[in-house]
Amino acid sequence: MNELIKHKLELLPDSPGCYIHKDKNGTIIYVGKAKNLKNRVRSYFHGSHNTKTELLVSEIEDFEYIVTGSNTEALLLEINLIQENKPKYNIRLKDDKSYPFIKITNEPYPRLLITRQVKKDGGLYFGPYPDSGAATEIKRLLDRLFPFKKCTNPANKVCFYYHLGQCKAHTICQTDQTYWDSLKEDVKNFLNGRDDKIVNELRDKMTKASELMEFERAAEYRDLIEGIGLLRTKQRVMNQDMQDRDIFGYYVDKGWMCVQVFFIRQGKLIQRDVNMFPYYNESEEDFLTYVGQFYQDNRHFIPKEIFIPRNIDETLVKAVVNTKIIKPQRGEKKQLVNLATKNARVSLQQKFDLLEKDIRKTHGAIENIGDLLNIPKPVRIEAFDNSNIQGTSPVAAMVVFVDGKPSKKDYRKFKIKTVIGPDDYASMREVIYRRYSRVMRDGLTPPDLIIIDGGQGQVNVARDVIENKLGLDIPIAGLQKNDKHQTHELLFGDPLEVIPLPRNSEEFFLLQRIQDEVHRFAITFHRQLRGKNTFSSKLNGIAGLGPKRKQLLMKHFKNLPNIQKASLDDIINCGIPKNVAENIQESLREEREKG
Protein backbone atom coordinates (compact mmCIF):
# COMPACT_ATOMS: atom_id res chain seq x y z
CA MET A 1 0.00 0.00 0.00
CA ASN A 2 1.56 3.29 -1.10
CA GLU A 3 1.49 6.60 0.76
CA LEU A 4 -1.24 8.11 -1.45
CA ILE A 5 -3.60 5.24 -0.68
CA LYS A 6 -2.79 5.46 3.05
CA HIS A 7 -3.72 9.12 3.08
CA LYS A 8 -6.88 8.64 1.00
CA LEU A 9 -8.11 5.81 3.23
CA GLU A 10 -8.11 8.16 6.20
CA LEU A 11 -10.39 10.60 4.36
CA LEU A 12 -13.11 8.26 3.08
CA PRO A 13 -16.69 9.34 3.92
CA ASP A 14 -19.33 7.26 5.72
CA SER A 15 -21.55 7.46 2.63
CA PRO A 16 -22.90 5.13 -0.01
CA GLY A 17 -21.21 5.25 -3.38
CA CYS A 18 -18.99 3.58 -5.94
CA TYR A 19 -15.25 3.05 -5.63
CA ILE A 20 -12.92 2.73 -8.61
CA HIS A 21 -9.60 0.90 -8.29
CA LYS A 22 -6.79 1.80 -10.71
CA ASP A 23 -3.44 0.24 -11.56
CA LYS A 24 -0.05 1.93 -12.03
CA ASN A 25 -1.06 3.11 -15.52
CA GLY A 26 -4.26 4.74 -14.26
CA THR A 27 -6.37 2.02 -15.89
CA ILE A 28 -9.60 1.11 -14.10
CA ILE A 29 -9.25 -2.52 -12.98
CA TYR A 30 -12.23 -2.86 -10.64
CA VAL A 31 -15.45 -1.02 -9.83
CA GLY A 32 -17.48 -1.76 -6.72
CA LYS A 33 -20.32 -0.29 -4.70
CA ALA A 34 -20.67 0.19 -0.96
CA LYS A 35 -23.28 1.22 1.58
CA ASN A 36 -20.37 2.72 3.52
CA LEU A 37 -17.38 3.73 1.39
CA LYS A 38 -15.05 4.06 4.37
CA ASN A 39 -15.62 0.53 5.64
CA ARG A 40 -15.71 -1.17 2.26
CA VAL A 41 -12.65 0.41 0.64
CA ARG A 42 -10.54 0.05 3.79
CA SER A 43 -11.35 -3.66 3.90
CA TYR A 44 -9.30 -4.22 0.75
CA PHE A 45 -6.12 -3.07 2.46
CA HIS A 46 -6.58 -4.68 5.88
CA GLY A 47 -6.96 -8.31 6.88
CA SER A 48 -6.62 -11.48 4.85
CA HIS A 49 -8.24 -12.20 1.48
CA ASN A 50 -8.68 -15.07 -0.91
CA THR A 51 -6.20 -15.50 -3.75
CA LYS A 52 -8.34 -13.67 -6.28
CA THR A 53 -8.78 -10.59 -4.10
CA GLU A 54 -5.10 -10.58 -3.13
CA LEU A 55 -4.21 -10.46 -6.83
CA LEU A 56 -6.54 -7.48 -7.31
CA VAL A 57 -5.14 -5.63 -4.28
CA SER A 58 -1.56 -6.20 -5.45
CA GLU A 59 -2.32 -4.17 -8.59
CA ILE A 60 -4.10 -1.24 -6.91
CA GLU A 61 -2.00 1.94 -7.06
CA ASP A 62 -4.80 4.49 -6.62
CA PHE A 63 -8.54 4.69 -6.15
CA GLU A 64 -11.36 7.17 -6.68
CA TYR A 65 -14.91 7.20 -5.41
CA ILE A 66 -18.25 8.76 -6.31
CA VAL A 67 -20.66 9.55 -3.49
CA THR A 68 -24.30 8.72 -4.27
CA GLY A 69 -27.59 9.54 -2.60
CA SER A 70 -28.39 5.95 -1.71
CA ASN A 71 -27.16 2.38 -1.91
CA THR A 72 -29.53 1.76 -4.81
CA GLU A 73 -28.04 4.62 -6.80
CA ALA A 74 -24.59 3.22 -6.02
CA LEU A 75 -25.68 -0.17 -7.37
CA LEU A 76 -26.99 1.30 -10.61
CA LEU A 77 -23.93 3.50 -11.07
CA GLU A 78 -21.71 0.46 -10.50
CA ILE A 79 -23.48 -1.39 -13.29
CA ASN A 80 -23.08 1.50 -15.70
CA LEU A 81 -19.40 2.00 -14.88
CA ILE A 82 -18.70 -1.70 -15.36
CA GLN A 83 -20.49 -1.72 -18.70
CA GLU A 84 -18.59 1.36 -19.88
CA ASN A 85 -15.07 0.56 -18.63
CA LYS A 86 -15.07 -3.26 -18.61
CA PRO A 87 -12.56 -3.53 -15.74
CA LYS A 88 -10.67 -6.80 -15.97
CA TYR A 89 -11.54 -7.98 -12.46
CA ASN A 90 -15.23 -7.17 -12.89
CA ILE A 91 -15.50 -8.86 -16.25
CA ARG A 92 -14.58 -12.19 -14.68
CA LEU A 93 -17.58 -11.83 -12.40
CA LYS A 94 -20.00 -9.94 -14.62
CA ASP A 95 -19.39 -10.74 -18.25
CA ASP A 96 -23.01 -10.46 -19.32
CA LYS A 97 -23.27 -7.88 -22.08
CA SER A 98 -26.67 -6.60 -20.97
CA TYR A 99 -28.57 -6.06 -17.75
CA PRO A 100 -32.29 -6.53 -17.10
CA PHE A 101 -34.87 -3.76 -17.20
CA ILE A 102 -38.52 -3.72 -16.22
CA LYS A 103 -40.68 -2.64 -19.13
CA ILE A 104 -44.26 -1.41 -19.45
CA THR A 105 -45.24 -2.29 -23.00
CA ASN A 106 -46.86 0.17 -25.38
CA GLU A 107 -49.82 -2.11 -26.17
CA PRO A 108 -53.59 -1.61 -26.02
CA TYR A 109 -53.50 -3.68 -22.81
CA PRO A 110 -50.05 -2.81 -21.37
CA ARG A 111 -48.03 -5.54 -19.66
CA LEU A 112 -45.10 -5.56 -17.22
CA LEU A 113 -42.13 -7.51 -18.60
CA ILE A 114 -38.47 -8.15 -17.84
CA THR A 115 -36.21 -7.51 -20.83
CA ARG A 116 -32.51 -7.08 -21.57
CA GLN A 117 -33.05 -4.96 -24.67
CA VAL A 118 -34.01 -1.28 -24.61
CA LYS A 119 -35.79 -0.24 -27.80
CA LYS A 120 -37.43 2.94 -29.01
CA ASP A 121 -40.83 1.28 -29.13
CA GLY A 122 -42.87 3.62 -26.96
CA GLY A 123 -42.43 1.45 -23.90
CA LEU A 124 -41.33 2.68 -20.50
CA TYR A 125 -38.08 1.16 -19.19
CA PHE A 126 -36.96 1.07 -15.56
CA GLY A 127 -33.45 0.03 -14.50
CA PRO A 128 -30.95 -1.34 -15.22
CA TYR A 129 -30.93 -3.93 -12.42
CA PRO A 130 -27.86 -5.93 -11.34
CA ASP A 131 -29.31 -9.33 -12.24
CA SER A 132 -32.51 -11.08 -13.20
CA GLY A 133 -33.18 -11.97 -9.56
CA ALA A 134 -33.33 -8.32 -8.50
CA ALA A 135 -35.52 -7.41 -11.47
CA THR A 136 -37.86 -10.36 -10.80
CA GLU A 137 -38.23 -9.42 -7.15
CA ILE A 138 -39.24 -5.86 -8.03
CA LYS A 139 -41.57 -7.00 -10.82
CA ARG A 140 -43.27 -9.43 -8.42
CA LEU A 141 -44.05 -6.52 -6.09
CA LEU A 142 -45.27 -4.38 -9.00
CA ASP A 143 -47.53 -7.21 -10.18
CA ARG A 144 -49.22 -7.30 -6.78
CA LEU A 145 -49.66 -3.54 -6.65
CA PHE A 146 -50.61 -2.60 -10.21
CA PRO A 147 -53.19 -4.61 -12.20
CA PHE A 148 -51.59 -4.64 -15.66
CA LYS A 149 -52.46 -7.43 -18.06
CA LYS A 150 -50.65 -10.55 -16.88
CA CYS A 151 -51.42 -13.08 -19.58
CA THR A 152 -51.89 -13.57 -23.31
CA ASN A 153 -55.57 -14.47 -23.03
CA PRO A 154 -58.05 -12.50 -25.14
CA ALA A 155 -59.54 -9.52 -23.30
CA ASN A 156 -62.95 -11.20 -23.08
CA LYS A 157 -61.53 -14.17 -21.19
CA VAL A 158 -60.58 -13.90 -17.53
CA CYS A 159 -57.29 -15.32 -16.24
CA PHE A 160 -55.99 -16.65 -12.93
CA TYR A 161 -54.57 -13.24 -11.98
CA TYR A 162 -58.00 -11.64 -12.41
CA HIS A 163 -59.27 -13.71 -9.49
CA LEU A 164 -56.29 -12.50 -7.40
CA GLY A 165 -57.15 -8.88 -8.19
CA GLN A 166 -53.92 -8.45 -10.13
CA CYS A 167 -55.26 -8.10 -13.70
CA LYS A 168 -57.96 -5.70 -14.90
CA ALA A 169 -57.64 -6.26 -18.65
CA HIS A 170 -60.90 -8.22 -18.68
CA THR A 171 -62.87 -5.37 -17.10
CA ILE A 172 -61.15 -2.31 -18.63
CA CYS A 173 -62.08 -1.43 -22.16
CA GLN A 174 -59.19 -1.36 -24.60
CA THR A 175 -60.02 2.19 -25.58
CA ASP A 176 -59.86 3.49 -22.00
CA GLN A 177 -56.38 4.92 -22.51
CA THR A 178 -56.78 7.28 -19.55
CA TYR A 179 -56.80 4.35 -17.13
CA TRP A 180 -53.63 2.80 -18.54
CA ASP A 181 -51.83 6.16 -18.68
CA SER A 182 -52.75 6.74 -15.04
CA LEU A 183 -51.47 3.28 -14.12
CA LYS A 184 -48.17 3.92 -15.93
CA GLU A 185 -47.78 7.21 -14.09
CA ASP A 186 -48.44 5.43 -10.78
CA VAL A 187 -45.61 2.96 -11.52
CA LYS A 188 -43.26 5.76 -12.53
CA ASN A 189 -44.06 7.67 -9.33
CA PHE A 190 -43.70 4.52 -7.27
CA LEU A 191 -40.24 3.69 -8.63
CA ASN A 192 -39.21 7.30 -8.15
CA GLY A 193 -40.01 7.11 -4.46
CA ARG A 194 -43.33 8.93 -4.58
CA ASP A 195 -45.19 6.03 -2.98
CA ASP A 196 -46.92 7.65 0.02
CA LYS A 197 -50.36 7.42 -1.58
CA ILE A 198 -50.04 3.68 -2.20
CA VAL A 199 -48.60 2.99 1.25
CA ASN A 200 -51.42 4.93 2.94
CA GLU A 201 -54.03 2.98 0.94
CA LEU A 202 -52.40 -0.32 1.91
CA ARG A 203 -52.30 0.70 5.57
CA ASP A 204 -56.01 1.53 5.46
CA LYS A 205 -56.74 -1.86 3.87
CA MET A 206 -54.56 -3.64 6.43
CA THR A 207 -56.37 -1.91 9.29
CA LYS A 208 -59.80 -2.76 7.89
CA ALA A 209 -58.78 -6.39 7.28
CA SER A 210 -57.57 -6.65 10.88
CA GLU A 211 -60.81 -5.16 12.18
CA LEU A 212 -62.73 -7.77 10.16
CA MET A 213 -60.36 -10.45 11.55
CA GLU A 214 -59.12 -11.24 8.03
CA PHE A 215 -55.62 -11.74 9.37
CA GLU A 216 -54.19 -13.51 6.34
CA ARG A 217 -55.23 -10.65 4.07
CA ALA A 218 -53.92 -8.14 6.62
CA ALA A 219 -50.59 -10.01 6.60
CA GLU A 220 -50.50 -9.74 2.79
CA TYR A 221 -50.94 -5.97 3.01
CA ARG A 222 -48.26 -5.83 5.70
CA ASP A 223 -45.86 -7.76 3.46
CA LEU A 224 -46.58 -5.38 0.59
CA ILE A 225 -45.83 -2.37 2.80
CA GLU A 226 -42.56 -3.97 3.91
CA GLY A 227 -41.67 -4.73 0.30
CA ILE A 228 -42.25 -1.10 -0.60
CA GLY A 229 -40.02 -0.08 2.29
CA LEU A 230 -37.16 -2.02 0.72
CA LEU A 231 -37.63 0.00 -2.45
CA ARG A 232 -38.01 3.37 -0.76
CA THR A 233 -34.62 4.39 -2.05
CA LYS A 234 -35.21 6.00 -5.42
CA GLN A 235 -34.77 3.99 -8.61
CA ARG A 236 -33.52 5.77 -11.71
CA VAL A 237 -35.92 5.70 -14.65
CA MET A 238 -34.87 5.26 -18.25
CA ASN A 239 -37.38 6.51 -20.77
CA GLN A 240 -37.42 5.48 -24.38
CA ASP A 241 -35.63 8.67 -25.49
CA MET A 242 -32.39 7.38 -23.85
CA GLN A 243 -31.19 10.99 -23.78
CA ASP A 244 -27.49 11.94 -23.69
CA ARG A 245 -26.79 14.57 -21.03
CA ASP A 246 -23.86 16.16 -19.21
CA ILE A 247 -24.50 17.18 -15.61
CA PHE A 248 -22.32 19.98 -14.21
CA GLY A 249 -21.76 20.77 -10.55
CA TYR A 250 -19.07 22.85 -8.90
CA TYR A 251 -17.84 23.90 -5.48
CA VAL A 252 -15.41 26.60 -4.38
CA ASP A 253 -13.32 26.98 -1.24
CA LYS A 254 -10.03 28.64 -0.26
CA GLY A 255 -9.49 30.09 -3.72
CA TRP A 256 -9.94 26.73 -5.47
CA MET A 257 -12.74 25.44 -7.67
CA CYS A 258 -13.68 21.82 -8.31
CA VAL A 259 -15.92 21.05 -11.28
CA GLN A 260 -17.52 17.64 -11.65
CA VAL A 261 -19.23 16.52 -14.84
CA PHE A 262 -21.42 13.42 -14.91
CA PHE A 263 -21.76 11.90 -18.38
CA ILE A 264 -25.17 10.36 -18.96
CA ARG A 265 -25.34 8.32 -22.14
CA GLN A 266 -28.49 6.57 -23.32
CA GLY A 267 -30.05 7.52 -20.02
CA LYS A 268 -27.31 5.97 -17.86
CA LEU A 269 -24.65 7.60 -15.72
CA ILE A 270 -21.49 6.00 -17.11
CA GLN A 271 -18.55 8.23 -16.19
CA ARG A 272 -17.45 11.47 -14.57
CA ASP A 273 -14.79 14.10 -15.12
CA VAL A 274 -13.15 15.87 -12.17
CA ASN A 275 -11.01 18.98 -12.40
CA MET A 276 -9.62 21.22 -9.66
CA PHE A 277 -7.90 24.55 -10.21
CA PRO A 278 -7.37 27.95 -8.55
CA TYR A 279 -9.85 30.60 -9.66
CA TYR A 280 -9.17 34.32 -9.77
CA ASN A 281 -12.43 36.02 -10.80
CA GLU A 282 -15.99 35.56 -9.62
CA SER A 283 -16.64 31.84 -9.30
CA GLU A 284 -19.58 31.98 -11.74
CA GLU A 285 -17.38 33.64 -14.38
CA ASP A 286 -14.59 31.10 -14.06
CA PHE A 287 -17.12 28.26 -14.15
CA LEU A 288 -18.52 29.60 -17.43
CA THR A 289 -14.99 29.83 -18.84
CA TYR A 290 -14.39 26.23 -17.83
CA VAL A 291 -17.57 25.00 -19.52
CA GLY A 292 -16.62 26.82 -22.74
CA GLN A 293 -13.14 25.30 -22.74
CA PHE A 294 -14.54 21.88 -21.86
CA TYR A 295 -16.22 21.56 -25.26
CA GLN A 296 -13.71 23.61 -27.24
CA ASP A 297 -12.00 21.99 -30.25
CA ASN A 298 -14.21 18.89 -29.90
CA ARG A 299 -12.45 17.83 -26.71
CA HIS A 300 -15.72 16.35 -25.49
CA PHE A 301 -18.85 15.14 -27.20
CA ILE A 302 -21.62 17.76 -26.96
CA PRO A 303 -24.80 16.01 -25.75
CA LYS A 304 -28.37 17.01 -26.50
CA GLU A 305 -28.78 18.52 -23.03
CA ILE A 306 -26.50 20.09 -20.44
CA PHE A 307 -27.67 20.55 -16.85
CA ILE A 308 -26.10 23.40 -14.88
CA PRO A 309 -26.59 24.81 -11.35
CA ARG A 310 -29.37 27.33 -10.78
CA ASN A 311 -27.04 30.27 -10.08
CA ILE A 312 -25.47 30.13 -13.56
CA ASP A 313 -26.83 32.23 -16.44
CA GLU A 314 -27.90 29.67 -19.04
CA THR A 315 -27.86 32.25 -21.85
CA LEU A 316 -24.12 32.70 -21.38
CA VAL A 317 -23.55 28.94 -21.49
CA LYS A 318 -25.73 28.76 -24.61
CA ALA A 319 -23.46 31.36 -26.21
CA VAL A 320 -20.43 29.07 -25.94
CA VAL A 321 -22.08 25.63 -26.31
CA ASN A 322 -24.66 25.11 -29.03
CA THR A 323 -27.06 22.73 -27.33
CA LYS A 324 -30.02 22.76 -24.95
CA ILE A 325 -29.06 24.22 -21.55
CA ILE A 326 -31.27 23.37 -18.57
CA LYS A 327 -31.26 24.63 -14.98
CA PRO A 328 -33.33 21.95 -13.20
CA GLN A 329 -35.61 23.39 -10.53
CA ARG A 330 -36.99 20.22 -8.96
CA GLY A 331 -37.19 16.47 -9.09
CA GLU A 332 -34.70 13.91 -10.31
CA LYS A 333 -32.88 16.28 -12.68
CA LYS A 334 -32.21 18.76 -9.89
CA GLN A 335 -31.00 15.91 -7.69
CA LEU A 336 -28.47 14.95 -10.37
CA VAL A 337 -27.03 18.48 -10.34
CA ASN A 338 -27.01 18.37 -6.54
CA LEU A 339 -25.16 15.04 -6.65
CA ALA A 340 -22.50 16.46 -9.00
CA THR A 341 -22.12 19.47 -6.69
CA LYS A 342 -21.87 17.25 -3.62
CA ASN A 343 -19.12 15.19 -5.23
CA ALA A 344 -17.28 18.38 -6.20
CA ARG A 345 -17.36 19.45 -2.55
CA VAL A 346 -16.15 16.03 -1.38
CA SER A 347 -13.29 16.00 -3.93
CA LEU A 348 -12.14 19.50 -3.04
CA GLN A 349 -12.27 18.77 0.68
CA GLN A 350 -10.28 15.60 0.11
CA LYS A 351 -7.64 17.62 -1.75
CA PHE A 352 -7.32 20.04 1.17
CA ASP A 353 -7.26 17.21 3.71
CA LEU A 354 -4.55 15.35 1.78
CA LEU A 355 -2.56 18.55 1.39
CA GLU A 356 -2.84 19.37 5.08
CA LYS A 357 -1.88 15.83 6.05
CA ASP A 358 1.07 15.93 3.65
CA ILE A 359 2.20 19.29 5.06
CA ARG A 360 1.98 17.97 8.61
CA LYS A 361 3.97 14.87 7.75
CA THR A 362 6.54 16.84 5.75
CA HIS A 363 7.01 19.39 8.52
CA GLY A 364 7.38 16.57 10.99
CA ALA A 365 9.96 14.90 8.74
CA ILE A 366 11.97 18.14 8.45
CA GLU A 367 11.99 18.59 12.22
CA ASN A 368 13.02 14.97 12.73
CA ILE A 369 15.89 15.30 10.25
CA GLY A 370 17.08 18.30 12.25
CA ASP A 371 16.88 16.27 15.45
CA LEU A 372 18.72 13.32 13.89
CA LEU A 373 21.57 15.58 12.74
CA ASN A 374 21.43 17.70 15.90
CA ILE A 375 20.94 20.91 13.91
CA PRO A 376 18.12 23.50 13.81
CA LYS A 377 15.10 22.60 11.66
CA PRO A 378 16.41 22.62 8.03
CA VAL A 379 13.66 24.66 6.39
CA ARG A 380 15.77 25.39 3.29
CA ILE A 381 17.75 22.49 1.83
CA GLU A 382 20.05 22.78 -1.20
CA ALA A 383 21.16 19.55 -2.90
CA PHE A 384 23.89 19.00 -5.53
CA ASP A 385 24.73 16.32 -8.09
CA ASN A 386 27.29 15.99 -10.90
CA SER A 387 26.65 14.40 -14.29
CA ASN A 388 29.03 13.39 -17.08
CA ILE A 389 29.64 10.45 -19.35
CA GLN A 390 33.31 9.58 -19.73
CA GLY A 391 34.17 13.17 -18.98
CA THR A 392 32.16 14.69 -21.85
CA SER A 393 29.99 17.75 -21.24
CA PRO A 394 30.45 17.69 -17.45
CA VAL A 395 27.69 19.53 -15.60
CA ALA A 396 26.26 19.88 -12.11
CA ALA A 397 22.85 20.81 -10.79
CA MET A 398 21.37 22.23 -7.62
CA VAL A 399 17.79 21.82 -6.44
CA VAL A 400 16.19 23.63 -3.54
CA PHE A 401 13.52 22.34 -1.16
CA VAL A 402 11.76 24.82 1.13
CA ASP A 403 9.49 23.38 3.84
CA GLY A 404 9.89 19.99 2.17
CA LYS A 405 8.62 21.19 -1.22
CA PRO A 406 10.62 21.83 -4.42
CA SER A 407 11.29 25.53 -5.02
CA LYS A 408 11.93 25.32 -8.76
CA LYS A 409 12.55 29.02 -9.22
CA ASP A 410 15.69 28.54 -7.14
CA TYR A 411 17.05 25.59 -9.14
CA ARG A 412 20.45 26.20 -10.76
CA LYS A 413 22.50 24.55 -13.53
CA PHE A 414 26.31 24.64 -13.73
CA LYS A 415 28.59 23.95 -16.68
CA ILE A 416 31.92 22.73 -15.29
CA LYS A 417 34.58 25.21 -16.42
CA THR A 418 37.86 24.33 -14.68
CA VAL A 419 37.91 20.53 -14.77
CA ILE A 420 39.22 18.39 -17.62
CA GLY A 421 38.06 14.78 -17.76
CA PRO A 422 35.85 12.83 -15.35
CA ASP A 423 36.77 14.14 -11.90
CA ASP A 424 33.74 14.22 -9.57
CA TYR A 425 35.67 15.64 -6.62
CA ALA A 426 37.12 18.57 -8.58
CA SER A 427 33.74 19.24 -10.21
CA MET A 428 32.03 19.30 -6.80
CA ARG A 429 34.72 21.64 -5.44
CA GLU A 430 34.16 24.09 -8.33
CA VAL A 431 30.37 24.08 -8.06
CA ILE A 432 30.23 24.50 -4.28
CA TYR A 433 32.71 27.37 -4.44
CA ARG A 434 30.82 29.12 -7.28
CA ARG A 435 27.46 28.75 -5.56
CA TYR A 436 28.37 29.92 -2.07
CA SER A 437 30.83 32.62 -3.03
CA ARG A 438 27.89 34.12 -4.91
CA VAL A 439 25.61 33.65 -1.90
CA MET A 440 28.10 35.68 0.13
CA ARG A 441 28.70 38.27 -2.58
CA ASP A 442 25.03 38.91 -3.44
CA GLY A 443 23.61 38.50 0.05
CA LEU A 444 21.44 35.52 -0.94
CA THR A 445 19.63 33.35 1.59
CA PRO A 446 21.97 30.54 2.72
CA PRO A 447 20.53 27.04 3.22
CA ASP A 448 19.99 25.39 6.58
CA LEU A 449 21.42 22.16 5.18
CA ILE A 450 23.48 21.18 2.13
CA ILE A 451 22.97 17.68 0.75
CA ILE A 452 25.52 16.11 -1.58
CA ASP A 453 24.45 13.26 -3.84
CA GLY A 454 27.51 11.14 -3.17
CA GLY A 455 29.67 9.44 -0.60
CA GLN A 456 32.42 10.40 1.80
CA GLY A 457 34.79 11.89 -0.80
CA GLN A 458 32.29 14.34 -2.28
CA VAL A 459 31.02 15.40 1.16
CA ASN A 460 34.54 16.07 2.46
CA VAL A 461 35.37 18.16 -0.63
CA ALA A 462 32.22 20.26 -0.15
CA ARG A 463 32.94 20.70 3.56
CA ASP A 464 36.51 21.82 2.83
CA VAL A 465 35.23 24.56 0.49
CA ILE A 466 32.47 25.73 2.86
CA GLU A 467 34.54 25.78 6.05
CA ASN A 468 38.14 26.41 4.93
CA LYS A 469 37.82 28.41 1.71
CA LEU A 470 34.69 30.44 2.45
CA GLY A 471 34.59 30.38 6.25
CA LEU A 472 30.90 29.48 6.36
CA ASP A 473 29.09 27.38 8.93
CA ILE A 474 26.51 25.34 6.99
CA PRO A 475 25.80 21.67 7.87
CA ILE A 476 26.59 19.25 5.03
CA ALA A 477 25.19 15.72 4.65
CA GLY A 478 25.68 13.05 2.02
CA LEU A 479 23.18 10.69 0.46
CA GLN A 480 24.86 7.52 -0.70
CA LYS A 481 23.24 5.11 -3.18
CA ASN A 482 23.49 1.33 -3.34
CA ASP A 483 24.56 -0.73 -6.36
CA LYS A 484 21.01 -0.45 -7.73
CA HIS A 485 21.33 3.34 -7.73
CA GLN A 486 18.74 3.70 -4.96
CA THR A 487 18.94 5.92 -1.88
CA HIS A 488 20.78 3.80 0.67
CA GLU A 489 22.13 5.76 3.64
CA LEU A 490 22.53 9.22 5.15
CA LEU A 491 26.06 10.38 6.02
CA PHE A 492 26.74 13.15 8.54
CA GLY A 493 29.15 14.29 11.22
CA ASP A 494 32.88 14.85 11.61
CA PRO A 495 34.12 12.27 11.01
CA LEU A 496 31.28 11.11 8.74
CA GLU A 497 29.10 8.31 10.01
CA VAL A 498 25.93 6.61 8.87
CA ILE A 499 22.80 8.07 10.48
CA PRO A 500 20.24 5.27 11.11
CA LEU A 501 17.05 5.98 9.20
CA PRO A 502 14.08 3.56 8.89
CA ARG A 503 13.28 2.98 5.22
CA ASN A 504 9.55 3.36 5.79
CA SER A 505 9.89 6.69 7.61
CA GLU A 506 8.74 10.07 6.31
CA GLU A 507 12.31 11.33 6.81
CA PHE A 508 13.68 8.68 4.44
CA PHE A 509 10.97 9.39 1.84
CA LEU A 510 11.73 13.13 1.93
CA LEU A 511 15.48 12.61 1.48
CA GLN A 512 14.79 10.11 -1.29
CA ARG A 513 12.63 12.66 -3.12
CA ILE A 514 15.38 15.26 -2.83
CA GLN A 515 18.04 12.87 -4.15
CA ASP A 516 15.85 11.68 -7.02
CA GLU A 517 14.99 15.25 -7.98
CA VAL A 518 18.57 16.55 -8.06
CA HIS A 519 19.65 13.50 -10.07
CA ARG A 520 16.79 14.01 -12.54
CA PHE A 521 17.61 17.71 -12.93
CA ALA A 522 21.33 17.05 -13.46
CA ILE A 523 20.91 14.23 -15.96
CA THR A 524 18.31 16.20 -17.95
CA PHE A 525 20.67 19.18 -18.19
CA HIS A 526 23.53 16.91 -19.23
CA ARG A 527 21.48 15.32 -22.01
CA GLN A 528 20.40 18.72 -23.30
CA LEU A 529 23.98 19.99 -23.38
CA ARG A 530 25.32 16.82 -24.96
CA GLY A 531 22.60 17.01 -27.61
CA LYS A 532 23.54 20.60 -28.43
CA ASN A 533 27.22 19.70 -28.66
CA THR A 534 26.49 16.75 -30.94
CA PHE A 535 24.22 18.94 -33.02
CA SER A 536 26.87 21.63 -33.37
CA SER A 537 29.74 19.25 -34.13
CA LYS A 538 27.85 17.52 -36.94
CA LEU A 539 27.25 20.88 -38.60
CA ASN A 540 30.82 22.14 -38.30
CA GLY A 541 32.64 22.96 -41.54
CA ILE A 542 29.53 23.49 -43.66
CA ALA A 543 30.07 26.46 -45.95
CA GLY A 544 27.94 29.46 -45.03
CA LEU A 545 26.75 27.96 -41.72
CA GLY A 546 27.95 30.06 -38.81
CA PRO A 547 26.91 30.18 -35.13
CA LYS A 548 23.79 32.29 -35.71
CA ARG A 549 22.44 30.02 -38.43
CA LYS A 550 23.21 26.95 -36.31
CA GLN A 551 21.17 28.56 -33.55
CA LEU A 552 18.31 29.13 -36.00
CA LEU A 553 18.38 25.45 -36.97
CA MET A 554 18.52 24.33 -33.34
CA LYS A 555 15.59 26.52 -32.38
CA HIS A 556 13.46 25.37 -35.30
CA PHE A 557 14.30 21.65 -35.58
CA LYS A 558 15.35 20.89 -31.96
CA ASN A 559 17.68 18.02 -32.94
CA LEU A 560 19.80 16.58 -35.75
CA PRO A 561 17.43 13.76 -36.83
CA ASN A 562 14.73 16.36 -37.54
CA ILE A 563 17.11 18.25 -39.85
CA GLN A 564 18.06 15.02 -41.60
CA LYS A 565 14.37 14.30 -42.28
CA ALA A 566 13.60 17.89 -43.37
CA SER A 567 13.08 18.85 -46.99
CA LEU A 568 15.05 21.62 -48.69
CA ASP A 569 12.04 23.94 -48.42
CA ASP A 570 11.70 23.18 -44.68
CA ILE A 571 15.29 24.31 -44.10
CA ILE A 572 14.89 27.42 -46.28
CA ASN A 573 11.66 28.37 -44.48
CA CYS A 574 13.45 28.66 -41.14
CA GLY A 575 15.64 31.48 -42.52
CA ILE A 576 18.55 29.64 -44.18
CA PRO A 577 19.62 30.74 -47.71
CA LYS A 578 18.99 28.17 -50.44
CA ASN A 579 22.67 27.56 -51.23
CA VAL A 580 23.49 27.01 -47.53
CA ALA A 581 20.47 24.70 -47.16
CA GLU A 582 21.77 22.64 -50.09
CA ASN A 583 25.21 22.49 -48.42
CA ILE A 584 23.57 21.25 -45.19
CA GLN A 585 21.68 18.47 -46.95
CA GLU A 586 24.77 17.39 -48.90
CA SER A 587 26.95 17.32 -45.76
CA LEU A 588 24.43 15.31 -43.75
CA ARG A 589 23.95 12.90 -46.66
CA GLU A 590 27.70 12.27 -46.77
CA GLU A 591 27.73 11.80 -42.99
CA ARG A 592 25.04 9.13 -43.23
CA GLU A 593 26.85 7.31 -46.01
CA LYS A 594 30.04 7.21 -43.92
CA GLY A 595 28.11 5.86 -40.93
Swiss-Prot record:
CDD domains: GIY-YIG_UvrC_Cho
A Pfam family that the UniProt record links to this protein: UvrC_RNaseH_dom
Any single Gene Ontology cellular-component annotation: excinuclease repair complex
GO BP field: nucleotide-excision repair; SOS response
PROSITE patterns to which the protein is assigned, alphabetical: GIY_YIG (PS50164), UVR (PS50151), UVRC (PS50165)
GO molecular function annotations of the record: DNA binding; excinuclease ABC activity
Keyword match DNA damage: yes
Family matches, as InterPro entries: GIY-YIG_endonuc, GIY-YIG_endonuc_sf, GIY-YIG_UvrC_Cho, RuvA_2-like, UVR_dom, UVR_dom_sf, UvrABC_protein_C, UvrC
GIY-YIG domain ranges (all copies): 14-91
Keyword DNA repair: yes
Domain UVR: 196-231
Predominant location category: cytoplasm
Gene3D superfamilies given in the database record: 5' to 3' exonuclease, C-terminal subdomain, GIY-YIG endonuclease, UVR domain, UvrC, RNAse H endonuclease domain
UniProt entry keywords in alphabetical sequence: Cytoplasm, DNA damage, DNA excision, DNA repair, Excision nuclease, SOS response
Localisation per UniProt entry: Cytoplasm
Role noted for this protein: The UvrABC repair system catalyzes the recognition and processing of DNA lesions. UvrC both incises the 5' and 3' sides of the lesion. The N-terminal half is responsible for the 3' incision and the C-terminal half is responsible for the 5' incision.
Subunit and partners: Interacts with UvrB in an incision complex.
Family recorded in the similarity comment: Belongs to the UvrC family.
PANTHER family: UVRABC SYSTEM PROTEIN C, UVRC/OXIDOREDUCTASE
Name of the featured protein: UvrABC system protein C
Organism: Streptococcus mutans serotype c (strain ATCC 700610 / UA159)
